[in-house]
Amino acid sequence: MSIIRNILLSAALFLFLSPANVNALSDAYKDNIYDAGPLKPVDSVLKVKPGQVAPDFTLKSLTGQKVTLSQYRGKKNVVLSFIPAAWTPVCSDQWPGYNIVKDLFDEHDAVLLGISVDSLPTLHSWTNQMGKLWFPVLSDFFPHGEVAAKFGILRSDGTAEGAIIIIDKQGLIRYIDVHDINRRPPLDSIVRELQKLRQG
């Protein structure tokens, strides 16, 4: 069974990391992507570290529901995926890629929360163009970037870093990856950290 799971995981990783993900997007969608060119890779100072309790927050989702981080305490591992901005090349490729690995999150008893400093109308338009996402998309628009600032990943230009933060069922931060804003975070790191949580 584990051999089959590893084969499926390898296939999912290949698909997720493949440039074909971008090419599969419609031309109309790609025409709306704003490319600012290379940006300063990291432009913030972390305020949290592994082993600490994650700062709690409540943000509104695209469905209009409010999502609070602590609502998952004792129930689910949480993966926070912070993106810098909607309608940008890396972000527009990253989130749709998670659609092909939903089972991976389910298997590791984890929920994915996508967070952006963009407004709800902007996120609504952007995610509608990219296609349905299975995870909640949350707006950290007002007070602007408040949640990103709590974690220390708000950049000087008002966008968030591209960051992955994994929080266990006890609410403790177990993994932080603030990656080069010009690159998509590696999925294999998320897989590895979720496997560690499952193994205890």
Regions found by a protein language model. Name each.
Residues S2-K60:
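N-terminal targeting signals for export/organelle localization
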Residues V48, F57-V78:
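A short beta-strand-turn-helix
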Residues A54-P55, V79, E161-A163:
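Short loop/turn microsegments at loop-to-beta-strand junctions
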Residues W134-F135, I153-I165:
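Structural micro-motif
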Residues P136-D140:
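Short acidic-hydrophobic, aromatic-tinged amphipathic segments that line or gate anion-handling sites
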Residues T159-G200:
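Thiol-/selenol-based redox modules, centered on thioredoxin-like
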